Amino acid sequence: MGKVTKNMILMVSSILLLSLTVSASAQRLNKLIELFENDQPAFGVLSFDYSLNNARAMASSGLDFLFIDMEHAPFDIERLRLFLLGMTDKRSIIEKGNLQPNVVPLVRIPAAGGAEELIAQAKQVLDVGVFGIFFPAVHTREQAELAVRATRYPQYNDAPDYEPAGLRGRNPSNAMWYWGVRDYHARADVWPLDPQGELLAMMFIESRAGVENIEEIITVPGLGGIFIGPSDLSTSMGYTSPAAPEVEQAIQTVLGACLEHDVPCAITTGQGSVQQRIDQGFRFVTVGADGGLNTGASNALRLGREAAGR
């Protein structure tokens, strides 16, 4: 092999490596946000199983996001950290040429109002690398504002989006390593307040008070989405089932506010409801629970994608 040929190979290799690096840095990391920006519905499941086998199964499931429920499962940060590492698909990273996870991990924390507890729990799950938080039982605008602030770092003095002032303590080493980026602090802000942000602060509306206050809640700067909890909502309204017409009316009230303000809205679904919910305007939905995709969840995922044209 001649000297010129060797130099050509080195030059081409350098160009390819540079292209991969640029692609990885420019690529949107949070797939759910990318789908929102492209007006495409997203599909996920609830996860209560922190095992490595389930992590691998979920990472290759074909879903868009994983709703890791730490409200109704143990709040165990070390198990969460190992679970996230288990979802890392190195082959996919190489094949795609970017660092975006195929399935975005999001966490619902247990705290439902206590400020100190909420801030601490949000900080801990963010510090291991999740891409967003579901905050349960949000009834008021003040709760939503606190949730957004707990998700953000304090901004630099010249930041155009300084408010709502962040409360998250800064020690991003684990999250930075998991995301695979050096500019974690710059990218770990809430979307859509920061258009380049990769974090989602999402509020669960699951009470009569939450429905009544939805217009105030939904206009909080930094709010990234609304998730309607039909079961708790029906209980809050005094009904034994989400099928009650009054509960569905409340669901449509929240959805209508989301559509009016262009805020992504989510709800739990199954085979019998996923197509209807997508047609109604829900932007992201869960289609079942984890442990691998069972037949019902797989069918719901298929029907949802067909309804969404994906």
Q: Language-model segments: which ranges?
A:
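Bacterial N-terminal signal peptides that target proteins for export
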Residues: M1-V12
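Expand to "…catalyze enediolate/carbanion chemistry for C-C bond making/breaking, isomerization
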Residues: A24-R310
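Bacterial N-terminal signal peptides
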Residues: L10-L20
